[in-house]
């Protein structure tokens, strides 16, 4: 069974025991979280498609760790002016493991 969940402005196709990196959530490592914005749930032809979300469906997960992504450099240069500016950014991420997919009753 799989589900498509929405979190952090993105959509992820998940199944049980999947490990995925998502946008930062306020939760410590080892905490249990629940995603209620489920867009699709099921398997094959009997998949339930929400409008926009499947009522009563949820996906349970546990937080594995909090980390940061690779550094992205924003570099601006003004030609012939001997002027440049460099700025780095590292996005915060949360790594979660999907533990259970609960279908609507």
UniProtKB/Swiss-Prot annotation:
- Family matches, as Pfam families: Ribosomal_L21p
What's in the keyword line of the UniProt record? Ribonucleoprotein, Ribosomal protein, RNA-binding, rRNA-binding
User: Among its keywords, does the record have RNA-binding?
Assistant: yes
One GO cellular component term: cytoplasm
InterPro entries per the record?
A: bL21-like (IPR028909), bL21-like_sf (IPR036164), Ribosomal_bL21 (IPR001787)
One annotated GO molecular function is: structural constituent of ribosome
Keyword Ribonucleoprotein among UniProt keywords? yes
Q: Which GO terms describe its biological process?
A: translation
Q: Which domain of life is it from?
A: Bacteria
NCBIfam families per record: L21
Q: What function does this protein fulfil?
A: This protein binds to 23S rRNA in the presence of protein L20.
Q: Into which family does the record put it?
A: Belongs to the bacterial ribosomal protein bL21 family.
Assembly, per entry: Part of the 50S ribosomal subunit. Contacts protein L20.
- Can you say what this protein is called? Large ribosomal subunit protein bL21
